[in-house]
Amino acid sequence: MAVAPINMVRRVAEYALTEIPAEKISLGIPNYGYDWPLPYEQGVTKAETINNLQAIGIAIDHGVPIQFDETAMTPYFRYWQSGVQHEVWFEDVRSLKAKFDLIKELDLSGVGYWQIMNYFRANWLLLADMFEIKEGIL
């Protein structure tokens, strides 16, 4: 359960462009992940919201490899804790780059972040590398 799978983000953005001019659309970028206990039951299972560095730390602590879903363009992994399997989806440089590339491809006005308080240095380095920021806006 990716936070913002690029295939779905693309569909929403392309639909939005049929109704709204590109210069009025900013793409929302998640700056967090979810740690889901499994099995998932709709309406019952609740995920814990974690930041991207916490996600990486959990993978390291549990010695599990981080996988990458090529369709969603999103990293994820599974681990066990106290007899419960968990699945973690979060953002990394690869997933962020896919979203930034989409902004350029569709000529959108910029980005907005759902959660800016979770510092993820790689995001800001990539953002500065790919875009010119003027007067506090992208």
Regions found by a protein language model. Name each.
Residues M1-Y40:
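Active-site region of glycoside hydrolase catalytic domains
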Residues V3-R10, F90-K97, N118:
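Soluble non-cytosolic domains of exported or imported proteins
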Residues V9-L17, F100, W124-F131:
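Generic structural signal for well-ordered alpha-helices
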Residues L27, I103, V111:
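Conserved, mostly hydrophobic/aromatic
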Residues I29-L102, A128-L138:
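Glycan-binding loop/region signatures in secreted carbohydrate-active enzymes
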Residues F100, W114-I116:
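C-terminal functional modules
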Residues I116-A122:
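Acidic-and-aromatic substrate-binding clefts and catalytic sites of carbohydrate-active enzymes
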